Design a protein with these regions (language model features):
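Gly/Ala-rich beta-loop-alpha elbow adjacent to hydrolase catalytic centers
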Residues: 95-99, 103
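Catalytic active-site module of serine/aspartate enzymes centered on a nucleophile-bearing elbow/loop
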Residues: 239-285
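Active-site loop/oxyanion-hole signature of alpha/beta-hydrolase fold enzymes
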Residues: 52-91, 257-266
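Conserved alpha/beta-hydrolase "acid-adjacent" motif
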Residues: 222-228
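Conserved HGGG/HGGXW glycine-rich cap/lid loop of the alpha/beta-hydrolase fold
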Residues: 8-62
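Short beta-strand/loop motif that positions the catalytic acidic residue
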Residues: 210, 216-218
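Flexible "cap/lid" loop of the alpha/beta hydrolase fold
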Residues: 104, 108-109, 114-145
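Hydrophobic, aromatic-rich cap/lid helix
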Residues: 171-203
Length: 285
């Protein structure tokens, strides 16, 4: 797969489709982009070019642990720089969960570069913030405190990053544990500060100021709650909201975790909704 040097790290990326308006999609958590290939292929069939990439610290891209703002802000600026290198601006930006946070931060930081937002499984609320802060940051800080960078390299996530790009081990081992812990703590604190926001990553005022068209698909689990999606849809002035893509569940009976199989089975419907919004936004409908 092609690679690009972006803001001090090498990013692994792929473009699906050969012509048409540009789209960038990003998965949730720190997962590789590969799960989004089938959805991207469906969009490409309708004449769009889809940019997929592994974010820094994810998949086959380089590790880059830097204490500059939040991790999601770094990811958003990386994607903007990568898309600029490829001549892919402006573009529709989308993603699920962490990828949706990236997309919203991209729009807040680079509004002139965004044609529209394609969002599914938005994250919000105290339960989600506490759970994910531990998953993304606290556990790794504890590993570094107990066993140094050797322990971090042996973790499930970073061992996968090393398997995908062996040079990542040397990059991690070159870090002082104290600096690694400082950055994890900084990123954790930035994440925890979002517990009372409508969604993780944006205030009410910021959401109201996003004027581009938005397709927003609600989740049905305790991390990606329908309440969070409804709040965001009510604040985004040009949002088209869908809460019937996956099984609708009452707010007091949500799944503990999202169901990957359920979401995969709904990809044709997700593609249909995204294509409808993009066709209208580009005048192709």
């Amino acid at each position: 797969m092609p690679e690009a040097s972006v803001r001090g790290v090498i990013l692994n990326y792929e473009v699906i489709g050969s012509e048409g308006p540009w789209v960038a999609l990003t998965p949730g958590s720190r997962r590789s982009y590969h799960e989004l290939i089938p959805l991207s292929q469906r969009l490409a069939q309708d004449g769009y070019r889809v940019l997929l990439h592994d974010r820094r610290n994810c998949g086959a891209s380089e590790v880059g642990i830097e204490g500059i703002g939040s991790e999601h802000e770094i990811w958003a600026d990386d994607l903007h720089a990568l898309a600029g290198q490829l001549g892919a601006l402006p573009l529709f930006v989308g993603g699920s969960s962490a990828g949706a946070r990236l997309a919203i931060l991209f729009a807040l930081r680079h509004p002139e570069a965004v044609s529209g937002l394609l969002l599914w499984r938005l994250t919000g609320g105290q339960h989600a913030v506490q759970k994910l802060a531990r998953q993304y940051y606290e556990q790794f800080a504890e590993m570094a405190k107990a066993g140094g960078m050797v322990a971090v390299c042996a973790s499930e996530h970073f061992s996968e990053c090393i398997a995908a790009r062996p040079s990542n081990r040397a990059r991690l081992m070159a870090m002082q544990p104290a600096e690694f812990i400082r950055v994890m703590d900084l990123w954790r604190d930035n994440f925890l500060a979002a517990a009372t926001l409508p969604i993780v990553g944006a205030t009410e005022e910021q959401l109201r100021n996003l004027k581009m068209p938005v397709c927003l698909i609600a989740g049905n689990d305790k991390v990606h709650t329908p309440v969070t999606a409804r709040k965001a849809a009510g604040l985004l002035p040009n949002a088209v909201f869908h809460d019937d893509v996956v099984e609708k569940r009452p707010d007091d009976n949500l799944l503990d975790d999202w169901n990957p199989a359920e979401w995969r089975s709904k990809e044709p419907r997700i593609a249909e909704l995204f294509l409808a919004l993009m066709a209208k936004a580009t005048g192709r409908s």
